[in-house]
Amino acid sequence: MGSTTSSQKFIARNRAPRVQIEYDVELYGAEKKVQLPFVMGVMADLAGKPAEPQAAVADRKFLEIDVDNFDARLKAMKPRVAFNVPNVLTGEGNLSLDITFESMDDFSPAAVARKVDSLNKLLEARTQLANLLTYMDGKTGAEEMIMKAIKDPALLQALASAPKPKDDEPQA
């Protein structure tokens, strides 16, 4: 089964729905089973703190939401949070957060960190350190060279001010 075919649609095609409401009716002396469709509507304010005011409840329409259109519906809804949290990074003041979500992936800790400037810098540093660790794995003497560069401020400054290699230039 490909990624475009969901398992929920497979179940819907191959198995009867779980909720079946049926009752026996007597029509003109004959008993007949009648099935009632089960339709459920949920009303919820999922936008959090919307940037623009929402329509009145009476003016809102029901939307069909399924696995295929969930991210599009979420993006159209523009769920948003805005609040202040204590700044535990520097220990001074509060951080003002204002985050708008567009897909389910935006709720992951890394995606939230990318939307907060001070956390994004830490996340980038963590990613670069993880890349460095992967690069150094199995290279003899690499750890000693890194420790030597960290302990020698003059060497560290020279390495930081050295021109970076250009990856854009075509090689002959």
Swiss-Prot record:
**InterPro entries this protein is in?**
T6SS_TssB1 (IPR008312)
Q: What happens without the gene?
A: Deletion mutant shows a clear reduction in E. coli killing.
Supply the Pfam families for this chain. T6SS_VipA
Does the entry annotate any disulfide bonds, and if so which pairs? none
Role according to the record = Core component of the H1 type VI (H1-T6SS) secretion system that plays a role in the release of toxins targeting both eukaryotic and prokaryotic species. Forms the sheath of the structure by assembling into tubules together with TssC1 resulting in the stacking of cogwheel-like structures showing predominantly a 12-fold symmetry. The sheath contracts to provide the energy needed for effector delivery.
Subunit architecture: Forms a heterodimer with TssC1. Heterodimers assemble to form the sheath of the T6SS machinery. Interacts with TagJ. Interacts with TssA1.
This chain's protein is named Type VI secretion system sheath protein TssB1
Q: What is the lineage of its organism?
A: Bacteria, Pseudomonadati, Pseudomonadota, Gammaproteobacteria, Pseudomonadales
Q: Which gene encodes it?
A: tssB1
